[in-house]
């Protein structure tokens, strides 16, 4: 799940 950046699998 992305936290605000691009689209990471975690964070």
UniProtKB/Swiss-Prot annotation:
Biological process terms in GO annotation: neuropeptide signaling pathway
Record has DNA-binding as a keyword: no
One GO CC annotation: extracellular region
Domain of life the protein comes from: Eukaryota
Main location: secreted
Compartments (UniProt record): Secreted
Residues where Asparagine amide is found: 11
Pfam family, one: Periviscerokin
Covalent S-S links between cysteines: none
Nucleotidyltransferase among keywords: no
Family: Belongs to the periviscerokinin family.
Protein name: Periviscerokinin-1
Record lineage: Eukaryota, Metazoa, Ecdysozoa, Arthropoda, Hexapoda
């Amino acid at each position: 799940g992305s936290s605000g950046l691009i689209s990471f699998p975690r964070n």
